[in-house]
Amino acid sequence: MSALRRLRNFCIPWVAMIALGCFSDAVAQTSYKVTDLGTEGNDILGCAMSLNNEGWTEVMAQNLPPGQQDNLGGMLLSGRLFADIDGLKFDLGTLGGTNTSSNWGEINDFGEVVGFSETAVPDPNGEDICGFGTHLTCRPFLSQFLHMRALPTLGGNNGQASSINNRGQIVGFAENGALDGTCTAGITNNRIALPAIWE
């Protein structure tokens, strides 16, 4: 048998096997059903921030100023968080201020939700940690059974809760009240914020 024929007999099965392997991956692709969860009221920005094993979602609804609708880094005018449970949206409320939001927050399998909320108290240092331009104190929160309560900080005025697991452990950051000396002059959000876990 010639070398060319042996090479052909070797290559054809390998090429066929690779082609069939690629084809089977294409056929086995998962298909998805996409559902529009909608926005609330006059809000123009809506985002599902988290999904638990029950199919419940944490939904953020926010507004951006005119002309900044396509700029996700823009100043937020307003924000609310909702728990979407089987298609019914429940407003999680606030801690006394106007706005609530989350950092890719979390809803665990028990329906506990974390995020951050403005209080009615102006920040004594003029910080705007919640990012709504109100300069109100921004506190991390835990919502259980649709009842929101503030989580403590590390001695500072502000913080944010980012995620919660099924053991009820919460992570985020909290200020310790100390001035961050590395901030340049004129920076308003100038306090030290440390990673935190609430257990």
What does each model-found stretch correspond to?
Residues 2-199:
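Residue-level hotspots at or immediately adjacent to binding/recognition sites across diverse folds
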